[in-house]
């Protein structure tokens, strides 16, 4: 099955779904949403830029355990804003952010001091989505041409989670699985990295499921 651009679709005929705990994350979201509204008023972004993102979550380390929070989709209106949102969160060993758009693509970003690592599940998403296009620009990778859209290929640092135990081949295999929704791909990665429960809760909040 292919999408409107003739690319293989990521979505399978049945979404396995996930059960999770739902809580109030207004306190977490408030600061980020306020920053977004100020930027929107200044003309830096529009609601149409934001609406394409289905979820954004942040993962960070506190003493001896992992924490994860849902973020407003507004923080992924542009890549710089997403990175800055991750930098604002104090953490032992840096922060990780995940974002997903429909059944098209997902993005992982790790921030440690001034170092930023990124992994984009499908570089052809840059044809349609500004966030994906900005990732390719940051990686100095050209946006695919029309005759390069037949194959879904990832872009970025395949070793982004190698220090946490996820090898390059494993991450590549997740990105290549066209039957996974972005949220399920992210949940699977998080489980492998031993912060699965925290990310599941954050995804449930972000997706309202």
List each language-model region with its residue ranges.
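Compositionally biased, low-complexity flexible segments
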Residues: 1-20, 27-31, 35, 39-42
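Solvent-exposed, flexible loop/coil residues
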Residues: 5, 75, 139, 143
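Charged, low-complexity surface segments at secondary-structure and domain boundaries
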Residues: 40, 67-72, 120-121, 174-175
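Short, extreme N-terminal leader segments that mark the start of a protein/domain
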Residues: 41-71
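Compact, well-ordered interaction domains used in eukaryotic information-processing assemblies
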Residues: 48, 70-128
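Generic structural hydrophobic/aromatic packing signal, biased to beta-strands
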Residues: 56-58, 98, 135
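Charged, compositionally biased boundary regions
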Residues: 127-209
């Amino acid at each position: 099955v292919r999408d409107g651009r003739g690319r293989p679709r990521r979505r399978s005929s049945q979404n396995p779904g996930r059960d999770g705990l739902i809580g109030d994350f207004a306190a977490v979201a408030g600061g980020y949403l306020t920053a977004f509204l100020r930027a929107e008023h200044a003309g830096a972004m529009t609601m149409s830029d934001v609406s394409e993102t289905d979820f954004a979550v942040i993962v960070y380390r506190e003493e001896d355990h992992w924490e994860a929070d849902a973020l407003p989709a507004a923080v992924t209106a542009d890549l710089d804003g997403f990175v800055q949102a991750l930098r604002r969160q104090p953490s032992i060993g840096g922060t990780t952010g995940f974002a997903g758009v429909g059944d098209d693509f997902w993005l992982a970003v790790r921030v440690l001091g001034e170092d930023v690592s990124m992994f984009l599940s499908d570089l052809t998403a840059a044809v349609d989505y500004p966030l994906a296009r900005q990732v390719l620009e940051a990686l100095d990778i050209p946006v695919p041409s029309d005759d390069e859209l037949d194959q879904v290929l990832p872009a970025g640092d395949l070793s982004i989670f190698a220090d946490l135990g996820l090898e390059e081949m494993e991450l590549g295999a997740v990105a290549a699985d066209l039957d996974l929704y972005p949220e399920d791909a992210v949940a699977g990665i998080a489980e492998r990295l031993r912060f699965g429960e925290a990310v599941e809760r954050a995804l449930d909040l972000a997706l309202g499921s």
